[in-house]
Amino acid sequence: MIKVNSSQFNHIYNNRIHFPYSIALLAGYVKTQKNIHKHFRFEKTFVFRDNLDSNIEQCKDTDILLCSCYVWNWQITTRFAKEVKKINPECTIIFGGPQIPNHIEDFFKEYPFVDIAVHGEGEFIISNIFEAYLKDRNYTNVNGISTKDFTTPPQKRIENFENLPSPYLTNMVWDLVDRVDGISWIASWETNRGCPYLCTFCDWGSATATKMRKWTDERLFKEIEWFADNKIPYIDCCDANFGIYQARDKQLAVKLKEEKLKKGYPQTFRTNWA
């Protein structure tokens, strides 16, 4: 069994911390690929910043390390991965997330401990990397990645979300974390992906001026119920423009309020606007 560790370090806000949503998306999709999944074992994701030495030690025999990279965790993630490579040089370290640059000429000179950098949506790419890892570890046919030796063509954006399982409805987010007394969890939530705009001072993300794709109403309503049933206090909506689908997004807002009034959760909903 191939051991997979992962990190998505976050900050604690008022005794709350984000679920490792991005890692859960990847693990959930890999789990649907039966011929691949049976060979890989996902360990708990590292999210807390105060256990770094222990986290490094836990990776001394890991085969693959997935690191979800954002501006707020870049320094600790690179430090962590560098130390893992020192004690476990055979570990394949894969970086992905919004912090990975598209122009990567000097990236591997500065971060030589990284083996593969993933560009864009990671679900299909990670699955393809795992498939190549099982076969011959030749990644030249995996789209959407860079190594120190090559960059492959971009991976096409995912058009059909039906095959992407919910990290909440499958409880994947719970599978990847240790519950800690006194700590509650923040749920990152996507109702769609993409953004039709190209604002000069955008601080949302890199998928601007792209076709928008959305999840089904049924799934989103069930996820809202899951948030309430699991007493999730804070929803961090990752959409670029919540409300752009006016009729549907109003229904989601009404559903959020209904669950709050009935069950007491979620308590806060944060989103982005154009």
Show where each model-derived region lies.
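Hydrophobic/aromatic residues located in beta-strands of well-ordered beta-sheets
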Residues: 4, 42, 93, 142, ...
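Glycine- and acidic-residue-enriched helix-capping/strand-helix junction motifs
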Residues: 11-23
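A structural signal for short coil/turn segments at secondary-structure junctions
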Residues: 34, 88, 111, 230-231, ...
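N-terminal [4Fe-4S]-dependent radical SAM core
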Residues: 5, 142, 147-188
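Short amphipathic alpha-helix
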Residues: 21-28, 223
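Conserved beta-strand positions
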Residues: 6, 67, 95, 119, ...
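Radical SAM [4Fe-4S] cluster-binding motif and immediate context
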Residues: 167-274
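Glycine-rich beta-alpha loop elements in corrinoid/cobalamin-binding modules
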Residues: 29, 38-158
